[in-house]
């Protein structure tokens, strides 16, 4: 949904006039840029997303128009990164967030970063609208690499993945294979371990002898008050599982 909210909030666009955009109309107007609109903003995107998807399904909005909005927003993002990149003083990366999730709000988000100065990048990013399965993202990155476009995916907030970020099965419930491991490692060889929304290092349930295992824990699935399953959600445990697999060869 890259660029969609900004377009829907702008008077004079087809998005603005669509009934599905009512929640975000004028949300960025000067009179609304204050803390009193925080409650509205926290609710606006979810409603806009659901209503807009329904409008696409019912053909009340043109999916081609939405695609053109995303392409323009992506071009603006690339231009901003290029404009502000000042090596040695301020480094920018051309990238975006792939926001996949499980049906129960388990977080499967990745930051996707492209190598270089933007001379060779895709015309539009791969999103959950293309596929909600990370395997689809990695296969897309492989295809880009064949065209000379190098990229890197960085999983983040695995702590909120409900056990799916480092599950011992793929997205379709199949056992992990050598081909799966190679596909994943080719495209996301690193992982974020900590950030403001909690650490993804370990959990007291997984590291019972580590007195620091409860440091900066955010135990919920992202944007919910539902507990996230620890097993399969933390990096240290994932590393141990990987070592077991390697030793079992």
Predicted regions span which residues?
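Extended, charged catalytic domains and RNA/DNA-binding interfaces, predominantly
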Residues: 1-249
């Amino acid at each position: 949904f890259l660029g969609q909210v900004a377009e829907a909030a702008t008077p004079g666009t087809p998005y603005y006039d669509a009934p599905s955009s009512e929640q975000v109309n004028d949300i960025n107007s000067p009179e609304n840029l204050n803390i009193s609109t925080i409650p509205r903003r926290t609710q606006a995107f979810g409603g806009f997303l659901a209503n807009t998807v329904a409008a696409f399904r019912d053909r009340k909005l043109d999916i081609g128009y939405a695609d053109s909005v995303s392409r323009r927003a992506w071009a603006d993002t690339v231009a901003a990164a290029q404009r502000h990149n000042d090596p040695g003083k301020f480094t920018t990366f051309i990238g975006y967030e792939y926001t996949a999730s499980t049906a129960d709000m388990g977080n499967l988000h990745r930051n996707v970063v492209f190598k270089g100065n933007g001379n060779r990048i895709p015309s539009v990013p791969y999103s959950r609208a293309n596929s909600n399965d990370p395997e689809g993202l990695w296969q897309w990155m492989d295809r880009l690499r064949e065209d000379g476009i190098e990229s890197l995916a960085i999983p983040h907030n695995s702590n909120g993945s409900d056990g799916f970020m480092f599950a011992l099965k793929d997205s379709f419930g199949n056992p992990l294979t050598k081909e799966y491991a190679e596909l994943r490692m080719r495209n996301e060889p690193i992982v974020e371990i900590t950030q403001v929304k909690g650490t993804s290092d370990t959990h007291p349930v997984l590291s019972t002898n580590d007195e620091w295992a409860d440091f900066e824990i955010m135990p919920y699935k992202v944007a919910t008050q539902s507990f996230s399953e620890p097993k399969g959600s933390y990096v240290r445990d994932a590393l141990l599982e990987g070592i077991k697999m390697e030793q079992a060869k």
